[in-house]
């Protein structure tokens, strides 16, 4: 158990137990909380990077005979983290110089937000991770045969305010589910033999599903999609003989 400044604390517990000469196990769990350092001005100075994490593990060893051992491992961890404490740095000198080259004047219209973290949607990363494995070892008179089977499951979600401003423009929610199965078989000579040799095989299979839709909100639909499209149409319409064109979007939310 521990505690620190900025509202950080953690606790963990582990137990070891030997039931018999043939079976023993250990198990444990933990929880961690981080209060965070950075504040978001657009969300009442809410901590951007606070986080919570917890998990548990189990290991069991079974020896049914003198030459056979089974080792089982299971571990799970869940975390929910805030993050991405990006802040506005202002218009760069290079951008101002480039605008002047193109005959345009660029002025700072967001001076009040320089150096401040200020975005309206809470950005975060959430993850659940499961790892498990079984190791079976058989000792014959002249060799040792071991087989290790592993499985991993990952389920995570990243939510990001992509405009990183106090305006309600657009965000992304990326979800991922990944599964991996692996197998390793090793055949080797026993220690102390004149000839030491080893051979084996390894293989794995993984399948992954990812989604990452971008959500344009009402202000984003207007400023990013509709206004940009109409600016392009104005340039086309300014050419001699070109038709007058325009676009109006009636949807307040658009998933892409």
Model-identified regions with their sequence ranges:
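Outer-membrane beta-barrel translocator/receptor signature
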Residues: 1-40, 46-56, 67-68, 128-130, ...
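Outer-membrane beta-barrel domain signature, strongest for Gram-negative TonB-dependent receptors
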Residues: 45, 51-198, 204-206
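Sequence/structural signature of outer-membrane beta-barrel proteins
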Residues: 4-8, 34-41, 79-81, 154-156, ...
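Conserved small/polar residues in nucleotide/adenosyl-binding loops
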Residues: 254-256
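Alpha-helix N-cap/helix-initiation motif
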Residues: 4, 46-49, 174, 239-243
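Short acidic-aromatic active-site loops that bind/stabilize oxyanions
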Residues: 1-2, 31, 122-125, 236-243
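Feature marks flexible
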Residues: 101-119, 204, 209-242
């Amino acid at each position: 158990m521990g505690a620190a400044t900025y509202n950080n604390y953690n606790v963990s517990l582990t137990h070891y137990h030997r039931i018999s000469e043939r079976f023993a196990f250990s198990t444990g769990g933990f929880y961690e909380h981080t209060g965070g350092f950075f504040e978001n001005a657009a969300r009442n100075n809410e901590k951007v990077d606070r986080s919570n994490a917890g998990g548990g593990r189990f290991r069991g060893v079974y020896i049914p005979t003198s030459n056979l051992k089974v080792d089982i491992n299971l571990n799970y961890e869940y975390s929910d983290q805030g993050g991405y404490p990006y802040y506005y740095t202002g218009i760069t000198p290079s951008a101002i110089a480039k605008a002047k080259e193109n005959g345009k004047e660029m002025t700072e219209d967001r001076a009040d937000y320089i150096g401040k973290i200020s975005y309206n949607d809470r950005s975060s990363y959430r993850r659940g991770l499961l790892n498990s494995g079984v190791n079976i070892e058989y000792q014959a008179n002249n060799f040792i045969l071991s087989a290790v089977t592993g499985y991993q499951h990952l389920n995570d979600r990243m939510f990001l305010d992509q405009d990183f401003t106090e305006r309600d423009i657009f965000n992304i929610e990326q979800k991922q589910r990944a599964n991996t199965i692996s197998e390793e078989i090793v055949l080797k000579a026993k220690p102390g033999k004149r000839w030491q040799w080893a051979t084996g095989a390894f293989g794995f299979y993984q399948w992954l599903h990812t989604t990452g839709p971008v959500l344009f909100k009402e202000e984003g639909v207007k400023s990013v999609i509709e206004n940009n499209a109409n600016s392009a149409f104005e340039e086309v319409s300014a050419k001699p003989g070109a038709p007058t064109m325009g676009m109006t979007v009636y949807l307040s939310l658009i998933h892409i």
